[in-house]
């Protein structure tokens, strides 16, 4: 498990998430959108394919079919979901 900061510009918030580093980016996007939607009482999960998870630390767009670990994401990294 890794602990990351996730910026979500749609709500203007930064959240801390504990994620399994072996999960794919697709699964991570699904999980964080579901949690944020519950917290914000909104539905951000429509058209999930349009969302991109990016590493602010590594300055790159993460590949949806690869795991967080495969892309070098570690504890204390900063991510942004746009």
Describe the role of every protein-language-model region.
Residues 1-82:
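Ubiquitin system architectures
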